């Protein structure tokens, strides 16, 4: 069995879920805001994402000059941010653990086949889902 979308009862798995996160000394309103900020090489620019909603951060992240190593570092950054989200919020960690051994799939209709899976075609690498399952395993091992 699988969780196919990070909505409804599973909305907390989404990076757009409103939960504060401290990352590299800056507190953001969501994991998405933290992630989008990391596209900027300059800390002052990253700080501008701190008060943005997830939607506004995603929009702003599409307008910044991306750091030159972004493609090489984005997976590691995402994993660190998602780990921070769940370790900083024990109630969210408990909810993640409650998914047991369900496969976590970031199914979407916007054709993101890197972080998720296109629900129309079933294609996708599902990197966000894989990160969540790794973090779930880490949390389970720590209990």
Task: Write out the residue ranges for each language-model feature.
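Charged, low-complexity intrinsically disordered segments
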Residues: 1-143
């Amino acid at each position: 069995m699988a969780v196919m979308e990070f909505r409804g009862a599973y909305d907390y798995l989404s990076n757009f879920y409103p939960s504060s996160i401290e990352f590299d000394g800056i507190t953001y309103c969501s994991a998405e805001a933290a992630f989008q900020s990391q596209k900027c090489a300059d800390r002052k620019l990253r700080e501008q994402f701190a008060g943005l909603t997830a939607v506004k951060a995603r929009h702003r992240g599409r307008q910044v000059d991306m750091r030159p190593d972004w493609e090489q570092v984005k997976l590691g950054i995402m994993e660190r941010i998602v780990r921070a989200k769940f370790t900083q919020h024990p109630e969210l960690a408990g909810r993640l653990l409650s998914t047991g051994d369900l496969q976590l799939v970031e199914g979407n209709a916007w054709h993101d086949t890197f972080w998720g899976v296109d629900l129309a075609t079933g294609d996708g690498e599902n990197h966000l889902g894989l990160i969540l399952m790794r973090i779930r395993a880490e949390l389970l091992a720590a209990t």
